[in-house]
């Protein structure tokens, strides 16, 4: 019956997860349309590929749709959703459409609170180098492919599995990865960490009897749930009991060198073209899957050496020049942009920057994401943000939430100041962030812009300001 569905409409098509699925379906021969509130690189790419994208939401946008796909960000009173209900057009949540794609291939699903996008990208890159030509759907731009999705001719599909709304429980993969489990998106789990842990256990139960759960043994919560998992397990990480174990890891000229040891295999020397110990862990997950699927170590080594990363995951913009102002001489600073918005991710990126740029002053421009996350992880943010040398703190990016008393940027800045390890500069309006950075930066600094909200536009503004120097 699926042949009767020809026209698929995406409500919120510009989102990272939505646009990737839309691109794969477009390449499968479906007619794709979609709507979003604004244009971005993803919508422009889809238009170039043949999709019809409309700015703004209206009932007439779904006039020819046989089905519509929605993300969790789309409200039930959206005019396109309302019109679809009235016309009895099937409304498919994004995760369910991803599950349908996974039925067409053998699925490899990457789950975990942190590291999903990079790990998914590493797995896709290694399998591609190994000749398996996978389909992939990633929550960020895979730089080497210039896209966040690709329809491959091979039998595997590699995709992120989203725990934020528990939608990963819709997937039926043959291989799963769990990178780590931390408290985030706790409203989905009634603020009960035990329920979050149980959801990951149930995720592994989606595997067939011959499926494999690839688990990071470095994570204490992953170790805690392992006795509840009744599937084949491969472990990875730095832990001495990990089956795929990284040893002798060190940062060299902005990338990581390490050795992988595993019973039945010769030690493998790896040069990973990404900084940070957390990326060594992510690479070990890719190595475990590559070996499970018969990819040669030589192909794996080549893919990891040539891996160019993912958009907004420690993206390096090179050196940015600035002019002399008053008593400050002209100079330049290294600019890095990152999507991290959880204290664990922030700590990992700061650590990676210390390794990639030893001895240089670290300036962090951070935009908290969501009032609920800022409230729930307030003390963790104070602890982590205090480890930078200079902090520019933006107001919280609401992401549709209403403000919460004492969970705003100004309160967080005050708490950091009281803690006494860093004296933050509070930047109330994100449009002022580029100029603020240019005013305080010194020659030789490393500037990291970080967050999941509108701070993503700051690097481009800094580059524009450099061009005017």
Swiss-Prot record:
Gene designation: murC
Pfam families found in the cross-reference section: Mur_ligase, Mur_ligase_C, Mur_ligase_M
Organism superkingdom: Bacteria
Name of the protein this chain belongs to: UDP-N-acetylmuramate--L-alanine ligase
Pathway annotation: Cell wall biogenesis; peptidoglycan biosynthesis
Subcellular location: Cytoplasm
Statement: the UniProt record of this protein carries the keyword Glycoprotein: no
Keywords, alphabetical: ATP-binding, Cell cycle, Cell division, Cell shape, Cell wall biogenesis/degradation, Cytoplasm, Ligase, Nucleotide-binding, Peptidoglycan synthesis
EC top class named in words: ligase
NCBIfam families in UniProt: murC (TIGR01082)
Family statement drawn from the similarity comment of this UniProt entry: Belongs to the MurCDEF family.
Cell division listed as a keyword: yes
Binding site for ATP: 112-118
Protein task: Cell wall formation.
Enzyme Commission numbers on file: 6.3.2.8
Any Gene Ontology biological process: cell wall organization
